[in-house]
């Protein structure tokens, strides 16, 4: 018989399954450590039940840090919510050690409340809610120094103990790389019976140092059988606020995202500029999408392609 997982269970897919300190005393320890008797993670059933009313999940990924995944996640969410007022959207910040969404979404200082159905995510707009470990810290400057099993346990809690309600789309802001957080969230959310319910969008900048890592992330998705909606090239150009001329801050020496997408057979969803208004909005938590500008023009095309992929 399977017992409930311990608080910091590393998960059955982890190399630490049945071996970690959290496994000591767990009735499932022998089963998890035996490769011939692997069980499905007992926490997955809880996740499936909690997420049953979430229609679609979208991972925002990039192998490279600093390319703007969190910024792109917040911009996509804001624009999708504004252009689809009858749909409900959620954001889950699984960048455990570097949560940015509370600031980007203008929710710094908000707290999470407990209800009979679990944690209640923070409401951003009438049709947008957000959950982040940033809401659970005593100070925005507190450092989170956790090993993989504890981070995985936190992600499982976010997926199984948050009352997400009815969502048309949940966007997941991820950390760089293909680490424990990625493996954990994929193992919980991937549904073999409905593989199209979990998809991914890649974020890159034009230079090859970013594209190298994005290629690895694309291959990660292919190995995990996660459909890729497409690639967003962020910071593709800079438009001067005085003269209006555009210039390339990060030159695409190898052809940028367009060349990589053609090479790997992945759709290019569009490009976002390096925009001073984005920087100001990120720091203040304001909604940039309510104004007509070069960024919202680009977001219109990108978001329409994302929504079309789920229809």
Swiss-Prot record:
Binds 4 [4Fe-4S] clusters per heterotetramer. Contains two stable clusters in the N-termini of Nubp1 and two labile, bridging clusters between subunits of the Nubp1-Nubp2 heterotetramer. [4Fe-4S] cluster 2 binds at residues 240, 243. The keyword tRNA processing does not apply. [4Fe-4S] cluster 1 binds at residues 9, 23, 26, 32. Pfam families: ParA (PF10609). It is found in: Cytoplasm. Signal peptide: none annotated. CDD domains: Mrp_NBP35. ATP binds at residues 63-70. Its cofactor is [4Fe-4S] cluster. GO terms for molecular function: 4 iron, 4 sulfur cluster binding; ATP binding; ATP hydrolysis activity; ATP-dependent FeS chaperone activity; iron-sulfur cluster binding; metal ion binding. Residues 1-21 are annotated as: Disordered. Keywords: 4Fe-4S, ATP-binding, Cytoplasm, Iron, Iron-sulfur, Metal-binding, Nucleotide-binding. GO terms for biological process: iron-sulfur cluster assembly. Coiled coil: none annotated. InterPro entries: Mrp/NBP35_ATP-bd, NUBP1/Nbp35, P-loop_NTPase, YlxH/NBP35. One of its GO terms (cellular component) is cytosol. Heterotetramer of 2 Nubp1 and 2 Nubp2 chains. HAMAP family: Mrp_NBP35, NUBP1. Component of the cytosolic iron-sulfur (Fe/S) protein assembly (CIA) machinery. Required for maturation of extramitochondrial Fe-S proteins. The Nubp1-Nubp2 heterotetramer forms a Fe-S scaffold complex, mediating the de novo assembly of an Fe-S cluster and its transfer to target apoproteins. Belongs to the Mrp/NBP35 ATP-binding proteins family. NUBP1/NBP35 subfamily. This is Cytosolic Fe-S cluster assembly factor Nubp1 homolog. It comes from Drosophila melanogaster. The lineage of its organism: Eukaryota, Metazoa, Ecdysozoa, Arthropoda, Hexapoda. The gene is Nubp1.
């Amino acid at each position: 018989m399977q017992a409930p997982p311990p608080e910091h269970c590393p998960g059955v897919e982890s190399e630490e399954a049945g071996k970690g300190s959290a496994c000591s005393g767990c009735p499932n320890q022998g089963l998890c450590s035996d490769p011939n008797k692997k069980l499905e993670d007992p926490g997955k059933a809880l996740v499936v039940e909690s997420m049953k009313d979430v229609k679609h999940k979208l991972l925002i990924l990039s192998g490279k840090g600093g390319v703007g995944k969190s910024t792109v996640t917040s911009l996509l969410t804001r624009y999708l919510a504004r252009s689809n007022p009858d749909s409900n959207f959620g954001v889950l910040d699984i960048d455990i050690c570097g949560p940015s969404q509370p600031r980007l979404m203008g929710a710094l200082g908000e707290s999470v409340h407990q209800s009979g159905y679990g944690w209640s995510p923070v409401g951003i707009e009438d049709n947008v809610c957000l959950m982040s470990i940033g809401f659970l810290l005593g100070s925005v400057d507190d450092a989170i120094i956790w090993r993989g099993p504890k981070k995985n346990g936190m992600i499982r809690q976010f997926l199984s103990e948050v009352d997400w309600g009815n969502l048309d789309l949940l966007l997941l802001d991820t950390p760089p790389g293909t680490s424990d957080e990625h493996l954990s969230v994929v193992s919980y959310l991937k549904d073999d019976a409905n593989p199209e319910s979990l998809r991914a969008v890649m974020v890159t900048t034009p230079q090859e140092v970013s594209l190298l890592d994005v290629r690895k992330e694309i291959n990660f998705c292919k190995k995990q059988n996660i459909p890729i909606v497409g690639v967003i090239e962020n910071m593709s150009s800079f438009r001067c606020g005085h003269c209006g001329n555009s210039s390339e801050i990060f030159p695409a020496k190898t052809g940028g995202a367009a060349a990589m997408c053609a090479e790997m057979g992945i759709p290019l969803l569009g490009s976002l500029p390096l925009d001073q208004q984005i920087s100001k909005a990120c720091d203040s938590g304001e909604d940039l999408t309510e104004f007509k500008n070069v960024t919202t023009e680009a977001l219109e095309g990108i978001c329409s392609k994302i929504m079309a992929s789920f229809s």
